[in-house]
Amino acid sequence: VHTPDGSPCGLLNHISLSCAPLPSEEIDCQMMSGKFKKLLTQLGMSPISSDFGLIYPHKYIPVVLDGRVMGYIDPNLAPKLVNSLRAIKIMQSNTDELYECVPKTLEIAYLAMIEDAETQSAQTKASDEEIKDKFYPGIFLASTPARFVRPVQNLEHGGIEFIGPLEQVNMS
């Protein structure tokens, strides 16, 4: 949607007849956090430790849940983690206790690295204008209320998936 009204364009693009605001939490976030961190670790994420003893490679990208960094993941493993989370979110049929912590309305926005530092240094340096439009890479997960979600058909997993605005513009 191309509208002259400026900043709300992304939200206007997301809103449809089936779009709905989430009035309350689907799952208790405090209870979910610990189990969810275990699940993300099983799917390939390196969790953050409280002793700050781990230093992650520069190329690793953050995994963020509701604004809190849960850990980091190798960019080569990130698509697999995202795909697995989508499958769990859509299927909701596995009886494993860890899978119960994934809400059906979880927003899974994967912002992949555009190019790594070696590729950029091998090519000509980008101008300030080109750099300005790039974003911070990571896997950004949102489970809190007061978000817009809308149902879409996920062709890969054969089910209905609820997506949010950030997720919509970064889906491939």
Features from the language model and the residues they span:
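Conduit-forming functional cores of very large proteins
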Residues: 1-172
